[in-house]
Structure formats: structure tokens, C-alpha cells
């Protein structure tokens, strides 16, 4: 009995020392940013940037942007936001999606592009961490040659380690409700991260992270469901004919991804499908198709962001360490990466069993990860419905449709939305604020 008591006391002391150590030594740097090049005047919110080292020798330096809630940071939730890719910078979220800044869409004239405030930032209702991950994305870098390339499951562990160290330094947020969010390819990483945090709360880590749930937009979840939904989606959106759709169904048997080379009929009709859809904007089918970043094209803002993020005055203001990376790119698709999660459905199941809330939303004009695939894998969970399919409204207008399930999962569409939420920022912001407050959409 006595030895057990002594062991318990020693263990508690070690955990306390470990927590203090994390808070004092494991954050590589953190700086409050009062102003940014390209933005006129002081920033109307509190921005912090910094690096946190993860790994045995803290060889991986993850860069982050932290923005306090513009409402009540002492009590509002804390949301970690992960961009997709894998390899896309968190500037995608900060400047194009749900952050408080955006690129001013002027034609580039050789001077520094301008930034403007946004009206529908999710920081109106929560504090947010925008994280550059995996290593090589955005401004994150490695101090040494990595023995193992990043992976889906490995990123979940690194993100968990990042959060432990970040909260060790920002203990005033340790009791705030915590959520993980993301879109696109992060549909593979976010559910695994939630499970990793949950596991850590039970097994190893003190203090526990106050994890409440997660939010995902147009998430890649299961290659079979998501890829095979593209052809039914194209038919429903009048991108292909009835005859071609029926021929595809008959010859491919519903599997358009793993077609046997000898199934020449199926391959022939898939080629016809591609001819019909190759010049469609994948991100939102009603937008112009653009092969280059021209001023009249939506992706022109990506070019402006590259000019902005590669400017030396911007890097100095953000406290980017010199000579850690070369040219900043919005999405570094060439990162060596191990795609070791083929389906995140089991993670969704485990997270629901553990009682975590989830909001899964889809822009209904996204061709990259169509809402049909998302609906299909959600149905495969066999959750009972507690609030059946209905429109959700903003100012007496239909903003989308929603359904709520017994396991605290809410699915919603955003009418007219695309692959990411910047196409419908007001609708997305109102949807998020209602959900995060526990209100029905």
C-alpha cells in the first residue's frame, strides 16, 4: 500500500514537472503581431505567430497563426484549423476561407498586394489556430533530414504533440472547449487527430485537452465513396447525358475507380465522361474554368497570396526564420508523403462512440468531393436520424439542407457552395456559429 502511494505521488509530480517543462521550453518562438505589410493600420484582432518543435529532437518546426476570438476569448471555443493537400499552407484558411483577412483583388502591378478585413470570419465566435502541416507546408520546416516521411497517422500524432506544447504555453486556453476542423484532404487527418487526442486524454497526458468535437468541410473520407460519387453527381448536374450515365452504370457496375484493364467498354465510357467534364471548374462547377491565374479567374487570389507571402517585409513581420524555406507556395504537392489512411470512416465511428460532436458540411456544387459521396459514407454508419432532412434558413432564404443524427453528427449542405467555404462565406459563418453554440441550424 505504501509503495503504491509513493509511486502515485511521484507520478503526479513527474506529470506536473512535465507540464511546466512543456510550457517553458518546448515552444520555439511566439510573437504578437500588431500590423502586417499590405494591411492599412493596426490589425483589428490579436494575431500571434510562432513555431513549435515536435519529434524526439524537436527536429520538425511547425509554424502557426493564432487569432484570439473577437468576442470572448476567455470562454469561446478554441478551433484548430488544418488545410488540405496534403501540403497546403494554412494561409489558405487564413486568407481565403474562415480567417479575418482576405486578399484585395486588385490586378498585380509589381507592388505588394493588399489585405482587407473580412466580415464573416469564424474568429467572431472562436479563437483559431491555423497550422502549417505536414512539415514542408507553408512555413513549417525540418532542421534535419527526416528518417520517415510524413503520413496521415503520423500527422495525427505530431498535431497532438503540437497541441500539448501549445496549450502548455497558453494555459489560459486549457479549459476552453476545443475543436479540430479542416476541409478537403484533411478529412483523412482530422478524424485521426481527434482519436489521437481522445486516446491521449485517457492514457498519457496531463492536463487533458478539453476536446468536444470536430468540423469538416467537403472532406475526402473514403476513396471508394468519394470517387465513385463523381459520375452520379455529374449526371444530376446535367454535365453528362442520360445515355452516357446508363452506359457507365451498366458497364462499370458502379465502380469507376478500379476498372479492370480488360473492361474496355467501361474505359471507353469513362473517356467520354472525361471529355464532357475536363473543362469544368472542379472547385465549383458554376465558376469559369481557368488554366492560368488571370485576373478574371477565382484562383487569381492564389497568385496574389504568393507575391505577398514571398515578400521579405511580410516574412519579417510574421517572424519567419531566415533560410528555413525557399519560395513559399500555397500548396506543396511534391512533399514526400505516406497516404496510410485509405478511409477515415472507422475514425468517425470511434469518435462518435466516444461522444464527440461533429459537423460535416458540403458545398453542393463541389465536383472534387461531391456531397453524394459524403452522404453515402454517413449512411454507412447506420446512425438513427433525430432531425430529418430539412432546409436551413438565413433571412427567410434557403441556405442549404441539413440532417442530424443520434450520435451527435450533423450533416449540412451549403447551397451554391464549392469545395471550400470562401464561395459562400456568410452562410458558412452562420452555420458554424449556430453549430458551435449547440443551436439547430
Swiss-Prot record:
Active site per the UniProt annotation: 184, 366, 419
Protein name: Serine carboxypeptidase-like 3
Gene Ontology CC annotation, any one: extracellular region
Source species, domain of life: Eukaryota
Coiled coil: none
One BP annotation, GO: proteolysis
A Pfam family annotated for this UniProt entry: Peptidase_S10
Tissue: Expressed in roots.
Residues carrying sugar: 109, 350, 382
One annotated GO molecular function: serine-type carboxypeptidase activity
Disulphide-bridged cysteine pairs: 88-331, 252-266, 290-297
Cell compartments where the protein resides: Secreted
Gene3D superfamilies, per database record: alpha/beta hydrolase
EC number(s) on file: 3.4.16.-
Higher taxonomy: Eukaryota, Viridiplantae, Streptophyta, Embryophyta, Tracheophyta
Signal peptide positions on this chain: 1-30
InterPro entries in alphabetical order: AB_hydrolase_fold, Peptidase_S10
Family, as annotated: Belongs to the peptidase S10 family.
Natural source organism: Arabidopsis thaliana
Keyword list, A-Z: Carboxypeptidase, Disulfide bond, Glycoprotein, Hydrolase, Protease, Secreted, Signal
Gene: SCPL3
Amino acid at each position: 500500500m505504501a509503495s503504491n502511494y509513493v509511486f502515485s505521488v511521484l507520478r503526479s509530480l513527474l506529470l506536473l514537472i512535465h507540464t511546466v517543462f512543456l510550457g517553458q521550453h518546448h515552444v520555439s518562438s511566439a510573437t504578437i503581431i500588431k500590423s502586417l505589410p499590405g494591411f492599412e493600420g493596426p490589425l483589428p484582432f490579436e494575431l500571434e505567430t510562432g513555431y513549435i518543435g515536435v519529434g524526439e529532437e524537436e527536429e520538425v518546426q511547425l509554424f502557426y497563426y493564432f487569432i484570439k476570438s473577437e468576442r470572448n476569448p476567455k470562454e469561446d471555443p478554441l478551433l484548430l484549423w488544418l488545410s488540405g493537400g496534403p501540403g497546403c499552407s494554412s494561409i489558405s484558411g487564413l486568407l481565403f476561407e474562415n480567417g479575418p483577412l482576405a486578399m484585395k483583388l486588385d490586378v498585380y502591378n509589381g507592388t505588394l498586394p493588399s489585405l482587407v478585413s473580412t466580415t464573416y470570419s469564424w474568429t467572431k465566435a472562436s479563437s483559431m489556430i491555423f497550422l502549417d502541416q505536414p512539415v514542408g507546408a507553408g512555413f513549417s520546416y525540418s532542421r534535419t533530414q527526416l528518417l520517415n516521411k510524413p503520413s496521415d497517422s503520423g500527422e495525427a500524432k505530431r498535431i497532438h504533440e503540437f497541441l500539448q506544447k501549445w496549450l502548455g504555453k497558453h494555459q489560459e486556453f486549457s479549459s476552453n472547449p476545443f475543436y479540430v476542423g479542416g476541409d478537403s484532404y484533411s478529412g483523412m487527418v482530422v478524424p485521426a487527430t481527434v482519436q489521437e487526442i481522445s486516446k491521449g486524454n485517457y492514457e498519457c497526458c496531463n492536463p487533458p485537452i478539453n476536446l468536444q468535437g470536430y468540423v469538416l468541410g467537403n472532406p475526402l473520407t473514403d476513396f471508394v465513396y468519394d470517387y465513385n460519387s463523381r459520375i452520379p453527381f455529374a449526371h444530376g448536374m446535367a454535365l453528362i447525358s442520360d445515355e452516357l450515365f446508363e452506359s457507365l452504370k451498366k458497364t462499370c457496375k458502379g465502380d469507376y475507380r478500379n476498372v479492370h484493364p480488360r473492361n474496355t467498354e467501361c474505359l471507353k465510357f469513362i473517356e467520354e465522361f472525361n471529355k464532357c467534364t475536363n473543362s469544368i471548374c472542379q472547385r465549383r462547377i458554376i465558376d469559369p474554368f481557368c488554366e492560368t491565374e488571370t485576373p478574371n479567374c477565382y484562383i487569381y487570389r492564389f497568385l496574389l497570396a504568393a507575391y505577398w507571402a514571398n515578400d521579405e517585409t511580410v516574412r519579417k513581420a510574421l517572424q519567419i526564420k531566415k533560410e528555413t524555406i525557399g519560395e513559399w507556395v500555397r500548396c506543396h504537392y511534391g512533399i514526400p508523403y505516406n497516404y496510410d489512411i485509405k478511409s477515415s470512416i472507422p475514425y468517425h465511428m470511434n469518435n462518435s462512440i466516444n461522444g464527440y460532436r461533429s459537423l460535416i458540411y458540403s458545398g453542393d456544387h463541389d465536383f472534387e468531393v461531391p456531397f453524394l459521396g459524403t452522404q453515402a459514407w454517413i449512411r454507412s454508419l447506420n446512425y438513427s436520424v433525430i432531425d430529418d432532412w430539412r432546409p436551413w434558413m438565413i433571412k427567410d432564404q434557403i441556405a442549404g439542407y441539413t440532417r442530424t443524427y443520434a450520435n451527435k453528427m450533423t450533416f449540412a449542405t451549403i447551397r451554391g457552395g464549392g469545395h471550400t467555404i470562401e464561395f459562400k462565406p456568410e452562410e458558412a459563418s452562420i452555420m458554424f456559429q449556430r453549430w458551435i453554440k449547440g443551436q439547430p441550424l
